[in-house]
């Protein structure tokens, strides 16, 4: 790859006043660093070389006023070509350019432009015109600048439109996200309320069960004294025992009446001399003496007296 330094020595040797001629130098690339070191070189001739592209840092040579890039093989200019704001004269004759960068509209000082012999886009070619003389090249510069400004404005509007679309899409996404978050909050709130209600019911059920447990001992305690005090005599066996004793007492009473009647007959009537009454009187006397000492009779008499 050929550079100016290897073909023609130091670039300063080629500097003539403010003009640096690097034409016909068989250059494949531009020595940007060396050119940046020569800010006095406001006129730069790079025509008739083998340049296919310009490096992006070439746009930092803002001191350039006149630039000749004719008869190279340039297919496009750097996107930041508009940074060369001091450029007044630009020759792009006989290259392979189809379009110009939008930043070209920033070359507000451009007065002269030649775009002949490039495979330009039809619209751009019509705007540029033929550029056959000085006047037409000046008109070319003016018309191309106006055209590129219009292209820039269109692109800016399109950019703004896309930004607006993106903003609207972002708003929709944010609104959707907010709605989703609100829905999730509402769901969590509902679940929390349901959980709270469930815990409340469990708590109420637990309290009710506890109250029931507390009532049972009280009920049993209330029932126990009544049973002991006899206010509610609900003892079937005692009733059966009482009825049995009543029958027994009745039989004993009848027996006593019968015996008493017989005893009376044997003791106070004329029958007491009869052998049977004599035996009865003897048995009676013995029975009375024994019964007086017997505990059963005392218990019967005591029970009878209590009732």
UniProtKB/Swiss-Prot annotation:
Coiled coil: 148-216
GO cellular component: cytoplasm; endoplasmic reticulum; endoplasmic reticulum membrane; membrane; mitochondrial nucleoid; nuclear envelope
Tissue: Widely expressed.
Lumenal side: 266-307
GO BP annotations listed: intracellular signal transduction
Name the record gives this protein: Leucine-rich repeat-containing protein 59
Subcellular location: Microsome membrane; Endoplasmic reticulum membrane; Nucleus envelope
SMART domains: LRR_TYP
The encoding gene: LRRC59
Quaternary data: Can form homodimers. Interacts with SGO1. Interacts with FGF1.
LRR repeat feature ranges: 10-31, 40-62, 63-84, 86-107, 109-128
Organism: Homo sapiens
UniProt-recorded Gene Ontology molecular function terms: cadherin binding; RNA binding
Pfam families according to UniProt: LRR_1 (PF00560), LRR_8 (PF13855)
Record flagged with keyword Phosphoprotein: yes
N6-acetyllysine modification, residue list: 135
UniProt keywords, alphabetically: Acetylation, Coiled coil, Endoplasmic reticulum, Leucine-rich repeat, Membrane, Microsome, Nucleus, Phosphoprotein, Repeat, Signal-anchor, Transmembrane, Transmembrane helix
Membrane topology according to the record: Single-pass type II membrane protein
Renumbered residue ranges of the record's region Disordered: 150-241
Role summary: Required for nuclear import of FGF1, but not that of FGF2. Might regulate nuclear import of exogenous FGF1 by facilitating interaction with the nuclear import machinery and by transporting cytosolic FGF1 to, and possibly through, the nuclear pores.
Positions in the Cytoplasmic compartment: 1-244
């Amino acid at each position: 790859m050929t550079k100016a330094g290897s073909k023609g020595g130091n670039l300063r040797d080629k500097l003539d006043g403010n003009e640096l001629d690097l034409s016909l130098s068989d250059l494949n690339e531009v020595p940007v660093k060396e050119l940046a070191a020569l800010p006095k070189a406001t006129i730069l001739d790079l025509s008739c070389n083998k340049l296919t592209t310009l490096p992006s840092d070439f746009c930092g040579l803002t001191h350039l006023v006149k630039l000749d890039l004719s008869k190279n093989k340039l297919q496009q200019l750097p996107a930041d070509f508009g940074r060369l704001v001091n450029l007044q004269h630009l020759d792009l004759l006989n290259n392979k350019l189809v379009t110009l960068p939008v930043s070209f509209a920033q070359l507000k000082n451009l007065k002269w432009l030649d775009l002949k012999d490039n495979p330009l886009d039809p619209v751009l070619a019509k705007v540029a015109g033929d550029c056959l003389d000085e006047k037409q090249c000046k008109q070319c510069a003016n018309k191309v600048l106006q055209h590129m400004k219009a292209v820039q404005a269109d692109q800016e509007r399109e950019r703004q439109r896309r930004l607006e679309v993106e903003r609207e899409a972002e708003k929709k996404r944010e609104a959707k996200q907010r709605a989703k978050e609100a829905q999730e909050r509402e769901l969590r709130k509902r679940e929390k309320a349901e959980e709270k209600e469930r815990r409340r019911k469990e708590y109420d059920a637990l309290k009710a069960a506890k109250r029931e447990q507390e009532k049972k001992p009280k009920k049993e305690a209330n029932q126990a004294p009544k049973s002991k005090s006899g206010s509610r005599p609900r003892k079937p066996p005692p009733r059966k025992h009482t009825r049995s004793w009543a029958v027994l007492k009745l039989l004993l009473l009848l027996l006593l009446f019968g015996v008493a009647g017989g005893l009376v007959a044997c003791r106070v009537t004329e029958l007491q001399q009869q052998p049977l009454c004599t035996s009865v009187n003897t048995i009676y006397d013995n029975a009375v003496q024994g019964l007086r000492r017997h505990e059963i009779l005392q218990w019967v008499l005591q029970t009878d007296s209590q009732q």
